[in-house]
């Protein structure tokens, strides 16, 4: 990892008036030029992290570093960090040009330089020619672009975005996801994005921090978070999941619904209680006798690209299936899946425990070079 641009070291926050602890020992390093997302439900602490980073709130304990320098006591205007707020915080009585140029005027930048940089920045956010427009006459998407232009015109080290897409309609929100991601990659500035929308996080991020009740419960790439959730909360919060109670018989063998199935997971105790995650899109509908499981279709909804089918097995477990095939309510169908489709979770395992287990398991599972060489020599002798 390169030298971090932002570091949180054991940062906690408690509001003194209520005594409520909203952050609990937050630790992370952010690299330069990446798109990070703080993802969590309302009240999870994600916006509090953003406000502490910006200098709008003080941490109760812990240290915050920017480029290796502690900034806990550094005023907002001295931090090379700019924020795009949920309501954009634009000046309604000013034009687009005046809003974007505001920070440069405070710094007493030359007028010609201001005009040049405003024009360049508006072009970046696809608002070229909007300089003299009134803020009040702009659409929601255009106002957001103005807010982003104002945040990046000084070329800050970090841009913070506090749920800036939440007020937009679905189509515009999707368009802005592409635009924000492309803009961040073009500028090479570190973006820290706050959202409760898991689809936004998965679509835009290099790295996601999943938050719950003031703690980071898992961090990783979008693929890691989706394919390898470490606990029930993450599996349930990120995408749709079928989560079934089971038993890890031994490495690569799990039992649930009274049957044993091959898996690709290991490193757990024999006969340890676990939870098994199967994503709805990984379940294939078959004839009942050909399926690994048999379920009875209860209801279904057409979601445009697939049918969302709800079915129940003989034990009463609910199953969600995504299929391009329409099912018949009341019919019994088979469900097929591969070992790779099963993700096994230990009960109440933390991210640190998960990482340590996987590292230890991989080391134990790797054959030594001496054994590999011996096997190869044996095969060569047999071929002679």
UniProtKB/Swiss-Prot annotation:
It is a peripheral membrane protein. Pfam families: ABC_tran, TOBE_2. Its main location: membrane. One of its GO terms (molecular function) is ABC-type polyamine transporter activity. Keywords: ATP-binding, Cell membrane, Membrane, Nucleotide-binding, Translocase, Transport. Its EC number is 7.6.2.11. Gene3D superfamilies: 2.40.50.100, P-loop containing nucleotide triphosphate hydrolases. Coiled coil: none annotated. ATP binds at residues 40-47. Belongs to the ABC transporter superfamily. Spermidine/putrescine importer (TC 3.A.1.11.1) family. This is Spermidine/putrescine import ATP-binding protein PotA.
């Amino acid at each position: 990892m390169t030298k971090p641009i932002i570091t949180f070291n054991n940062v906690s926050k408690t509001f003194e008036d209520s005594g409520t602890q909203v952050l609990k020992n937050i630790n992370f390093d952010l690299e330069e030029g990446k798109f990070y997302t703080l993802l969590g439900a309302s009240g999870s602490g994600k916006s509090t992290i953003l406000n502490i980073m910006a200098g709008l709130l003080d941490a109760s304990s812990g240290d915050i570093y920017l480029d290796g320098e502690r900034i806990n006591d550094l005023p907002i205007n001295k931090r090379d960090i700019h924020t795009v707020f949920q309501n954009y915080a634009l000046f309604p009585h000013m034009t687009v040009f005046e809003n974007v140029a505001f920070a440069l005027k405070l710094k007493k930048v030359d007028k010609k330089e201001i005009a040049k940089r405003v024009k360049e920045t508006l072009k970046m956010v696809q608002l070229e020619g909007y300089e003299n427009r009134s803020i009040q006459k702009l659409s929601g998407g255009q106002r957001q672009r103005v807010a982003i232009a104002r945040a990046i015109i000084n070329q800050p080290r970090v841009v913070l975005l506090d749920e800036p897409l939440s007020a937009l309609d679905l189509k515009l929100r999707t368009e802005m996801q592409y635009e924000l991601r492309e803009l961040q990659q073009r500028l090479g500035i570190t973006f820290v994005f706050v959202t409760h929308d898991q689809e936004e996080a998965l679509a835009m991020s290099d790295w996601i921090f999943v938050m719950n009740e003031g703690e980071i419960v898992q961090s990783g790439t979008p693929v890691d978070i989706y394919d390898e959730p470490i606990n029930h909360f993450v599996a349930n919060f990120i995408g749709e999941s079928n989560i079934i109670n089971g038993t890890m018989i031994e490495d690569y063998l799990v039992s649930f619904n009274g049957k044993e199935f091959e898996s690709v997971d290991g490193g757990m105790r024999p006969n340890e209680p676990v939870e098994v995650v199967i994503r709805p899109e990984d379940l294939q509908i078959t004839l009942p006798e050909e399926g690994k499981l048999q379920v009875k279709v209860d209801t279904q909804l057409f979601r445009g690209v697939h049918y969302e089918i709800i079915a129940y097995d003989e034990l009463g477990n609910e199953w969600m299936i995504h299929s391009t095939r329409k099912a018949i309510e009341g019919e019994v169908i088979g469900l097929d899946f591969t070992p790779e489709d099963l993700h096994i979770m230990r009960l109440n395992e933390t991210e640190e425990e998960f990482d340590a287990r996987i590292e230890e398991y991989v080391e134990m599972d790797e054959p030594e070079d001496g054994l590999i060489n011996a096997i190869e020599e044996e095969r060569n002798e047999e071929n002679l």
